[in-house]
Regions:
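Long, charged amphipathic alpha-helices with heptad-repeat/coiled-coil character
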Residues: 9, 16, 71-106
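Generic ordered-secondary-structure signal
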Residues: 7, 43-44, 129, 143
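Extended alpha-helical coiled-coil "stalk/arm" regions
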Residues: 22-62, 87-98, 102
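Domain-scale macromolecular recognition modules
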Residues: 73-76, 118-143
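Short, charge-rich amphipathic alpha-helices with coiled-coil/heptad character
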Residues: 1-15
Length: 143
C-alpha cells in the first residue's frame, strides 16, 4: 500500500512539474505580446500616417486580447498547480500515516519477541535451578 502512495506522490510531482513548465511557457508568450504592444506604440508615436496608426492600433488590440487569453490560461494553470500541490500533500500524508503504521507494527512485534525471549530465558533459568537442586539433593543422598 505504501508503494502505491509513493508512486502517486511521484506521479503527481511529475504532473506538477509539467503544469509549472506550461505556466512558464504562457508567461513567455505574455512577455512577447507585451513587447509587440510596446513596439506598436513606439511606431504610432513615430508616424503621422493614419493607415499605419490604424494598423498598429489593431495590432495592439490583438495583442491585448491575446494577453487576456494568456492570463486566463495562467489563472487556470495556477488553479491546477494549487490543486496538484494539495493532492501531493494529501498523498505524502498517506505515506507518513502508512509509515507510522508499519513502524508501530514493527515496534509491537519487537516487544512481543523481547517478551517471548525473556519468558524463554526465565524458563531456562528455572529449569537450571531445578536441575541444580535435584543434583544437590542426589549428592546429599549419596553422601
Amino acid at each position: 500500500m505504501i508503494d502505491t502512495y509513493r508512486n502517486n506522490v511521484s506521479r503527481k510531482r511529475t504532473e506538477l512539474s509539467k503544469l509549472s513548465s506550461d505556466r512558464a511557457k504562457e508567461s513567455a508568450k505574455k512577455a512577447q505580446q507585451k513587447q509587440k504592444i510596446i513596439s506598436a506604440t513606439n511606431s504610432i508615436n513615430r508616424t503621422n500616417s493614419q493607415s499605419i496608426i490604424r494598423s498598429k492600433r489593431s495590432e495592439i488590440e490583438r495583442a491585448e486580447k491575446e494577453i487576456a487569453s494568456i492570463d486566463k490560461k495562467i489563472a487556470d494553470l495556477d488553479r491546477k498547480i494549487a490543486q496538484k500541490e494539495t493532492e501531493i500533500a494529501n498523498e505524502e500524508k498517506k505515506v507518513r500515516t502508512e509509515e507510522d503504521k508499519i513502524r508501530k507494527k514493527q515496534e509491537q512485534e519487537d516487544k512481543k519477541r523481547q517478551k517471548d525471549n525473556e519468558k524463554t530465558l526465565k524458563e531456562i533459568n528455572q529449569a537450571i535451578s531445578m536441575q541444580q537442586r535435584m543434583q544437590f539433593d542426589m549428592q546429599k543422598d549419596i553422601d
